[in-house]
Every structure is written in structure tokens, then in C-alpha cells.
Amino acid sequence: SQEFAWIEQYLYLQKARFEDAFDYEIDLQEEYDMWPCCKLMLQPFVENAIIHGFKGREIGGMLKIMAKGQGEYIKIVINDNGYGIPEEREKAIQEIIKGNDVSDDLRIGIGIRNVVARIHIFYGDSAQISLWSKEGEGTKFEFLLPYPERKEECI
């Protein structure tokens, strides 16, 4: 989808901006290049990996994005070897993923809240998002998305 092209352009620009503090790989199975996808669905997760995961890093950051088929679904993984998410913030993000309200005290960005809501509207209840993070080791988001029931474009 156009989403992966935008992400590749975004990563190219950010890599230049941060003077090669990180590298990236995108592994997209060709048959899933046309999978219907919400606009800017992955960007907030990729941006957070760069801004927070690689903050202060001069070399050695690695961001991997993979999309492949899994039955009637597409599985998208965003994985970094950054600093990881502090436990309290991770718990708050887990609650957002479950659709629960969380306090703004932790300043969880609107980007993740917005994307999670749009994914569930567009793909339905069978869409799954999971998060794994360990401080000092990195963060991984996984999306398991069915072919959308809705035919109109996701906003």
C-alpha cells in the first residue's frame, strides 16, 4: 500500500536527519503491497521508535518493519533495538490498545490513540495489536489485520 512507500520515505529522511544513528529494513511481501491500510497507520509507531527508542544514540539503532500474510490476515511487525518503554508507560499503552481510557499524566501521544481507534473502526473487532517492550532491549508492535469489511477508504 501507499503506507509502506510513505514509511520508507519518512525513514530515509529521519536517517539523514539523525546522521545515521540508526538503520532500517522493510520486508514487505509483494502480494501484500496492495492490502487496504489506514493512512499514516504505522507512522506514529515508527516515529516513537526513532524519537524515544533511539534518543541520544549516535550509532547502532536498528528498526525493522515486516509485513507478511498469515491466513486471511496480514501481520505487520515494527521492531526496534532501542531503549524500550518504561514499564508505567507500557502499561498505559497496553490499556489504550485494549480500548480503555488512561490518564493523560503519562502524556501518551494522541497519535497512538488515534491509530488504535481507526484500526478498530476500519478492520473491525478481529484486528489485533500487541506490544512487547523491555527497557534496554527494545520494543515490538505487532498488528494482525483482516481484510477490511468496509470498502471505503480508511481515514
Question: What would you call each of these model-derived segments?
Answer:
Residues 1-132, 140:
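Two-component histidine phosphotransfer core
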Residues 139-147:
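Short C-terminal beta-strand
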Residues 151-154:
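Gram-positive cell-envelope targeting signals
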